[in-house]
């Protein structure tokens, strides 16, 4: 499977706190942002760097820069919103789009209800953000949408992934690289990841 689990002590520590039932929404939001930043450190290694000449206090030298104006961040509403600031802290000039998708509770099919994306071209580097890669149908739908808008270079950043969802994404979008903090055991009969952390959106926004 085309998936990179970012194995780091800080991520394991913070993710453990997020999983706990008694972790409140404020701490949950802060941890999601922090873990996303740590995952993004690895996920952004695919970005193209450009050579330039700079002047230090002592002499001229060669340097490098990333043109983050070519970067597009696309959180899947609503839980993906909690991941945006983590990447924007690293790439503050990136464009941000939004895709609204909900999972139909009976069929578990992905239904699009909103899509607002900035200009995307073949040189754009698109990060799709989805905290929980469960059945994979929402992520696949979002990947379909960004590719329909012209995206060629796409990375899926997720907090927790299931083996089932990872296989679905790999089958439908074999060119997309997945970065995650954890590959969990399995899905339950309702399509939730086990052991997981529950519904990320509900925990972020305290809607249950």
Curated annotation (Swiss-Prot):
Its EC number is 2.4.2.9. InterPro entries: PRibTrfase_dom, PRTase-like, Upp_B, UPRTase/APRTase, Ura_phspho_trans. Keywords: Allosteric enzyme, Glycosyltransferase, GTP-binding, Magnesium, Nucleotide-binding, Transferase. Binds 1 Mg(2+) ion per subunit. The magnesium is bound as Mg-PRPP. CDD domains: PRTases_typeI. PANTHER family: ADENINE PHOSPHORIBOSYLTRANSFERASE (PTHR32315), URACIL PHOSPHORIBOSYLTRANSFERASE, CHLOROPLASTIC (PTHR32315:SF4). This is Uracil phosphoribosyltransferase. It comes from Thermosipho africanus (strain TCF52B).
